[in-house]
From Swiss-Prot:
InterPro entries in the record: KH_dom-like_a/b, RbfA, RbfA_dom_sf, Ribosome-bd_factorA_CS
Quaternary structure and partners: Monomer. Binds 30S ribosomal subunits, but not 50S ribosomal subunits or 70S ribosomes.
Designated name of the protein: Ribosome-binding factor A
Principal location: cytoplasm
Keyword Cytoplasm: yes
Organism encoding this protein: Rickettsia typhi (strain ATCC VR-144 / Wilmington)
Signal peptide: none
Keyword Translocase (UniProt): no
Length: 127
């Protein structure tokens, strides 16, 4: 029987871990970043590297920020090349992966589900 989900290889997991560490370091220092990101606390929720190790999809979630989603995406995309250069200096590979940023909707979805469950339990209590 075939597996429904494909597991990441050791190399994919190792590269994702290194990229995560480098991104955290860059975000803490604020080096080489768009100025809009200085006062924007971000959490890197997960990093998924493609099987060919050429693309790293980085999922993030902002906390308590005045910036809009589009502002954050623009700032991250403006900083993308500097981040990739920093990652290139940290890894010893022939190619450095392209960095793609994605908003992580997991937290938003969890809040929606929680609200639905609460409203459903309230309806059950009233019936």
């Amino acid at each position: 029987m075939k597996k429904l989900t494909k597991t990441n290889s050791h190399r994919q997991q190792k590269l994702a871990s290194i990229i995560n560490e480098v991104l955290i370091e860059i975000l803490k220092r604020g080096k080489m970043l768009d100025r809009r990101l200085f006062d924007c606390p971000l959490t890197i929720t997960k990093i998924v590297v493609t099987a060919d190790l050429k693309i790293a999809n980085c999922y993030f979630f902002p906390f308590n920020t005045k910036l809009t989603f589009n502002d954050i995406m623009d700032a991250l995309n403006n900083s993308k090349h500097a981040i990739r250069n920093f990652i290139t200096n940290k890894i010893n590979m022939k190619f450095s992966p392209e960095i793609r940023f994605h908003y992580d909707y997991g937290f938003d979805n969890a809040i929606k589900i929680e609200k639905l469950l609460k409203s459903s339990s309230l309806k059950d209590k009233t019936n």
